[in-house]
């Protein structure tokens, strides 16, 4: 009997061990199978990221190559007088790539400047070069803009012409006419490389002032007034609708304020019965006034 029991135990034990091992291995198989979709997703993500990076790198290299070739064209074609030319680059990997060059004596230093517009996928890159007798100086390396317009005039009233680029972002919640201002200081009489950016400005060079509309929703965004001090801007004031009167009157502040978030700031301002006359010529005033009484349905 004891011998039979021992024999049964010897036979039964391997069966139990095999069963246990089989049971223990199944979760590992399931786990391995469950990891496959995650690994595939990670692989696809890595491939997409690598593809995007490679595409961006290729575009960047092509853009720089195009700019260098445009500058070589300037050197080859420029004969010491005004010159305009443009061309489209045929490239199977690029939907659209074009170059426009304009060369004139734009500023008061009597030097010739080449403004090079490189358009890639609808984004325009603007570069300005000063053309000397023995050298070419890169004065402006502009950002990429979406369908920009540029102009040259004396923006700060110092008697010298400045270079301005106006653009509009592809996406925004609110009015956003963006200006990049490249000044030409009176002492140098040539365009400088740094710039000042402003949103929704209107320029008053004879007064050495800028009046404009801040970025934000009507009713909560303000008007601003800046004064030029050489190549610098000083903040003078901000005008906001008074939420306590549902926007029928206004409040003048010396700092930019957010009455919706900081209601106590209302007490710091000067109450105005009406909008000051000087602001009625601001180009984006319609956006500032685009509010109704319902805008201020919060208790103040």
PLM region descriptions:
Residues 119-123, 173-177, 218-221:
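Short, solvent-exposed loop/turn segments at conserved positions within beta-propeller repeat blades
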């Amino acid at each position: 009997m004891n011998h039979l029991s021992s024999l049964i135990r010897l036979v039964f034990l391997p069966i139990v061990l095999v069963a246990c091992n089989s049971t223990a291995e199944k979760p590992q198989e399931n786990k391995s199978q469950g990891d496959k979709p995650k690994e595939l997703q990670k692989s696809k993500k890595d491939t997409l990221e690598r593809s995007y990076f490679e595409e961006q790198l290729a575009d960047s290299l092509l853009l720089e190559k195009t700019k260098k070739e445009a500058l070589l064209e300037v050197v080859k074609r420029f004969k010491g007088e005004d010159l305009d030319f443009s061309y489209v680059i045929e490239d199977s990997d690029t939907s659209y790539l074009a170059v426009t060059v304009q060369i004139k004596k734009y500023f008061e230093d009597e030097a010739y400047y080449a403004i090079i517009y490189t358009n890639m996928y609808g984004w325009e890159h603007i570069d300005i070069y000063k053309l000397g007798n023995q050298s070419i100086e890169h004065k402006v390396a502009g950002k990429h803009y979406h369908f920009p317009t540029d102009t040259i005039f004396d923006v700060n009233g110092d008697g010298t012409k400045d270079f301005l680029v106006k653009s509009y972002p592809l996406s925004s919640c609110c009015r956003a006419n963006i200006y990049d201002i490249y000044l030409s200081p009176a002492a140098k009489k040539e365009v400088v490389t740094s710039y000042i950016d402003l949103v929704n400005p209107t320029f008053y060079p004879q007064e050495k002032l800028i009046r404009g509309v801040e970025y934000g929703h009507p009713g909560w965004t303000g008007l601003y007034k800046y004064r030029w001090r050489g190549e610098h801007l000083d903040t003078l004031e901000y005008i906001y609708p008074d939420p306590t009167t549902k926007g029928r009157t206004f409040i003048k502040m010396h700092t930019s304020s957010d009455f919706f978030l900081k209601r106590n700031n209302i007490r710091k301002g000067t109450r105005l019965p009406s909008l000051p006359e000087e602001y009625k010529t601001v180009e984006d005033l319609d956006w500032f006034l685009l509010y109704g009484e319902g805008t201020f349905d919060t208790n103040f």
